[in-house]
Design a protein with these regions (language model features):
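Long, K/E/R/D-enriched contiguous segments that form extended
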Residues: 301-338, 384, 407, 459-465, ...
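Catalytic Zn2+-binding segment of zinc metalloproteases
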Residues: 403-417
Length: 567
C-alpha cells in the first residue's frame, strides 16, 4: 500500500464586496509557517519512520500473527498521518494562490521529499496481496481489533490482479511527481491566472467572477460574459488539448501495463463500486434525458419568454426572482439553522468551521476555482474552500461542503486508514447537508412564487448533479477510448464534447449551439486525482470520477438532493 495522502473530496487582502467579513484559512493548526521547526521535524521523522518500517517488515508480512500485523498497521497509519499533514499544509497554502511561484515551489519540494521518503513502503501492498486467501481470512478473523481494518485491506486486495512487479511499482511511485502531476499543476495555474475582460464591467475578472455573471438576471450581461469566456478559452485551447492528450495517453499506457480491461476500471475500484452498478445508473439517466433535462430547459425557455435558450441562459434566474446578494452572516445562519433542525450535534460539528478559520471563502486573484472540503489528517480537522459571491447557489455550495466537513469530523476517530471513504459515499454525506438546507428554505417559503423559484433551482441543481455528470462521464469514456487510436485535435475534442452536451441539453428545440460549447472542455476540472500527490486534479483524468456526483445525487434523489456545479 502506497501512502494515501488526504485529498479534497480548491492576495489575502481581497475585498468581500459587501458580503460581510469573508473568512480565510488559519493553517496554523497544521504548521505555523513554511519554515516552522515542526515541519522540519516531521519531515525528518517521516524519513526515519519509513526507513524503519521497511527494515522491520519488508519480506516478513506473511509471517506476522494478528498482534504483529496490528502493530504494523498502526505504524503505517502514523506514517500516513505525518505525510498527510505535510502535504495538506503545502497543498492548501498553494490553492490559496496558485500563481505564486514561492507557494508552487514549496508544494513541489514537499511532494518530492514525501515521495522520496515513502518509496521504501511500496512493498507493503504488493507483499500483502501475495498473502494466501486462507491465511488472509484467518488473520483478519483473529480478533475485533484487527477485524475492523478488513474493509480497507479488501479494497487494497481488489488491485491484486492489476499490480505490476515490485520494481515497476517503485518506478511509478518515484515518477509520480512529474508526468500527470506536473501537467495538472500547469492546468491549475493556467486556469487560476486567466483574466476576462467583459464589456460593461469596471475591471477584468477572474474565472469565478466571470462564471458568476452567467447567473445574472440581465441577459446582455450573461451574453457578454459567455463571449468573454469563449474568447479567452479559444486563446488557450491548444494548451488544454495538449494537457488532455498527454494525461489520457499516460493513463492508457499504465492501464495497458496493468491489464485493466477499461479506462474506467481503476476509478470503479477506487470508488468501491461494481461496473454493473455504474452502467445501470448511466443507462437509466441517459434514457431519461428527454423527460428530465430536455423537458425542463424547454419549460425554462417558456418562462423566460424565449423561443430558444442560448448557452448563457441555462443558469439564468427566473423573471420573478428577486435579485439580492446574500451576505456571509445570513449564509452561515441559514446553513447552521438547517443542520440544527435535523440534529443540534450536526450544527455543533459545523460551527467551528466558521469560528476557527477552517473556511476560506473570498474570491481572489490566483485562488483556485471551485469549492472543496479537504479532510487533512484525523488528528487535526478539515478545511473548506469556497469562492463565495452571495448567490443562492453559493449558499447551497456552503451547505454541500460543510456536509463533507461534518462527515470528515465524524469519521476522524476511525484513524487514517478507516476515515478515508470512497467518493460515492462521500458525496452522499454532502448532498445530505445540502438537502437539509434546501428543505428548510422550502418550508419557509410564504408565496407560490418563492416555492416555484426554490423548486426550479433544485431541479436545475439535480440536473447538474446527476444528469449532467453522466454526460461528462460518457464524454470522458469516449475521450479515453478515442485517444487509444491516436492524438486528438482540439476539433476532435470539441466534436465529442458537443455531441454529449447536445444529447444532454436537447439542442433542438431548446438550445442553439454556441462557440462556448466547443471550449467547455477546459472547464472539466474535477476529473483526475493523480495530481499533486492526489491532493486535487482537475484536467482530463480518470473516467468515472464525475460519476460520484451522480451516485450521491441518486442516493438522495427522493428528497431532491443536488450538487450545485459551475456552468
Amino acid at each position: 500500500m502506497t501512502i494515501r495522502l488526504p485529498r479534497p473530496v480548491f492576495d489575502a487582502d481581497a475585498s468581500a464586496g459587501g458580503l460581510g467579513g469573508l473568512p480565510e484559512w488559519d493553517l496554523s493548526d497544521l504548521y505555523a509557517a513554511p519554515d516552522a521547526p515542526e515541519l522540519a521535524r516531521d519531515l525528518a521523522e517521516l524519513e526515519r519512520a519509513c526507513a524503519a518500517f521497511a527494515a522491520d517488515y519488508e519480506g516478513r508480512l506473511a509471517t506476522l500473527d494478528a498482534k504483529g500485523m496490528l502493530g504494523c498497521i498502526h505504524r503505517h497509519e502514523r506514517i500516513e498521518a505525518l505525510a498527510g499533514r505535510i502535504m495538506s499544509y503545502a497543498g492548501l497554502r498553494y490553492y490559496q494562490n496558485t500563481t505564486d511561484a514561492g507557494r508552487a515551489k514549496f508544494l513541489s519540494d514537499c511532494q518530492d521529499r514525501v515521495t522520496e521518503f515513502t518509496t521504501p513502503l511500496v512493498f507493503f501492498s504488493l507483499e500483502f496481496n501475495r498473502i494466501e486467501d486462507a491465511a488472509y481470512t484467518a488473520l483478519f478473523s483473529a480478533n475485533d481489533a484487527i477485524a475492523r481494518y478488513r474493509p480497507a485491506f479488501d479494497r487494497m486486495r481488489a488491485m491484486k490482479p492489476y499490480q505490476l512487479s515490485d520494481e515497476l511499482e517503485r518506478f511509478l511511485h518515484d515518477q509520480s511527481t512529474v508526468g500527470a502531476s506536473a501537467w495538472n499543476k500547469l492546468f491549475d495555474e493556467t486556469m487560476a491566472g486567466l483574466s476576462f475582460t467583459v464589456p460593461g464591467e469596471p475591471e477584468a475578472l477572474n474565472l469565478e467572477a466571470t462564471l458568476n455573471l452567467l447567473s445574472e438576471p440581465e441577459r446582455p450581461r450573461r451574453e457578454a460574459a459567455a463571449h468573454a469566456l469563449a474568447g479567452v478559452f479559444s486563446s488557450n485551447i491548444k494548451l488544454f488539448a495538449r494537457v488532455h492528450n498527454t494525461l489520457a495517453k499516460e493513463k492508457e499506457i499504465e492501464d495497458r501495463w496493468r491489464r485493466m480491461p477499461t479506462p474506467q476500471t481503476g476509478r470503479h475500484l477506487s470508488n468501491d463500486v461494481e461496473p454493473e452498478v455504474v452502467e445501470a445508473l448511466r443507462n437509466a439517466v441517459v434514457a431519461a434525458y428527454p423527460k428530465l433535462s430536455h423537458r425542463y430547459y424547454a419549460l425554462k425557455a417558456k418562462w423566460l419568454g424565449l423561443d430558444r435558450l442560448q448557452v448563457w441562459d441555462r443558469n439564468a434566474p427566473l423573471p420573478m426572482e428577486e435579485k439580492r446578494v446574500i451576505g456571509w452572516a445570513e449564509a452561515r445562519a441559514t446553513v447552521l439553522d438547517s443542520y440544527a433542525s435535523f440534529a443540534p450535534e450536526m450544527a455543533d460539528l459545523a460551527a467551528p468551521f466558521f469560528d476557527k478559520g477552517w473556511i476560506d471563502a473570498g474570491v481572489r486573484p490566483g485562488k483556485a476555482p471551485g469549492a472543496f472540503a479537504h479532510p487533512t489528517v484525523t488528528e487535526v480537522h478539515p478545511y473548506v474552500m469556497l469562492n463565495y459571491l452571495g448567490k443562492p447557489r453559493d449558499v447551497m455550495t456552503l451547505a454541500h461542503e460543510l456536509g463533507h466537513g461534518v462527515h470528515q469530523r465524524l469519521a476522524a476517530p476511525q484513524g487514517e486508514m478507516l476515515a478515508s471513504t470512497p467518493l460515492t459515499l462521500a458525496e452522499t454525506a454532502s448532498v445530505f447537508g445540502e438537502m437539509l438546507t434546501f428543505r428548510r428554505l422550502l418550508a419557509g417559503a410564504t408565496t407560490p412564487a418563492e416555492r416555484k423559484i426554490l423548486l426550479a433551482g433544485k431541479v436545475e441543481d439535480m440536473i447538474n448533479t446527476v444528469v449532467r455528470q453522466i454526460a461528462f462521464y460518457d464524454f470522458e469514456c469516449k475521450l479515453h477510448a478515442a485517444r487509444r487510436e491516436g492524438e486528438l485535435t482540439p476539433e476532435d475534442l470539441r466534436v465529442r464534447l458537443h455531441a454529449g452536451l447536445r444529447d444532454l441539453l436537447g439542442l433542438y428545440p431548446a438550445f442553439r449551439p454556441f462557440p462556448l460549447l466547443r471550449l467547455r472542455l477546459c472547464l472539466r476540472r474535477r476529473v483526475g486525482e493523480r495530481a499533486l500527490c492526489r491532493l486535487r486534479g482537475r484536467a482530463a483524468g480518470f473516467p468515472g470520477e464525475v460519476f460520484r456526483h451522480a451516485e450521491g445525487g441518486r442516493i438522495e434523489a427522493p428528497q431532491g438532493a443536488s450538487r450545485p456545479l459551475r456552468p
